[in-house]
């Protein structure tokens, strides 16, 4: 904790935000049409990449945020646990059917992606909260725009890079 600047990241302009929304809108239909099992494979690959990058991410988080290394690893682990939960989302996406809900009435529900969703995350858990928001949304077929805290954006940006490497469009 030296107080030294660790990195400088420019704030997004309104035009950049609009471009991000338009890009997400354009990508979302194809992602939603990707079957849930294939979407989950991206999460599985992401977990593999995070496991390899865990120590470096914890060190980055500790330098930028001021957490201890064990606390930083815990922040990442709690986020990873939600990604692991999201691996089961294909089962949850099946919907329901009720035959004979009333005379001549059958009921069914279908679960569908919402579209473009966003996560605005706080500074105090820069790995955990983005993963809590991002993984379920992605597994369900949504496009996701992440707005990390300007106080410690490096780990959320690294998470985004790892998702790209894992195959997220």
Cite the ranges covered by each PLM segment.
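Glycine-rich loop-to-alpha-helix module at the N-terminal edge of alpha/beta enzyme cores
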Residues: 3-93
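Rossmann-like NAD(P) dinucleotide-binding subdomain of oxidoreductase/dehydrogenase enzymes
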Residues: 95-169
């Amino acid at each position: 904790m030296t107080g030294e600047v660790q990195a400088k990241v420019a704030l997004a302009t309104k035009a950049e935000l609009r471009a991000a929304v338009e890009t997400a809108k354009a990508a979302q239909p194809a992602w939603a049409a990707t079957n849930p099992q294939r979407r989950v494979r991206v999460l599985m690959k992401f977990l593999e990449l995070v496991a390899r990058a865990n120590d470096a991410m914890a060190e980055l988080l500790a330098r930028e945020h001021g957490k201890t290394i064990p606390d930083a690893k815990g922040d990442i682990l709690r986020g990873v646990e939600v990604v692991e939960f999201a691996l089961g989302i294909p089962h949850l996406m099946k919907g329901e059917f009720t035959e004979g809900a009333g005379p001549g009435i059958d009921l069914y529900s279908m679960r569908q992606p919402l579209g473009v969703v966003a996560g605005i995350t706080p500074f105090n858990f820069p790995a955990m909260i983005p993963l809590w928001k991002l993984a379920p949304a992605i597994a369900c077929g949504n496009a996701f725009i992440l707005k990390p805290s300007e106080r410690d954006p490096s780990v959320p940006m690294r998470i985004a890079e790892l998702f790209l490497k894992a195959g997220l469009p």
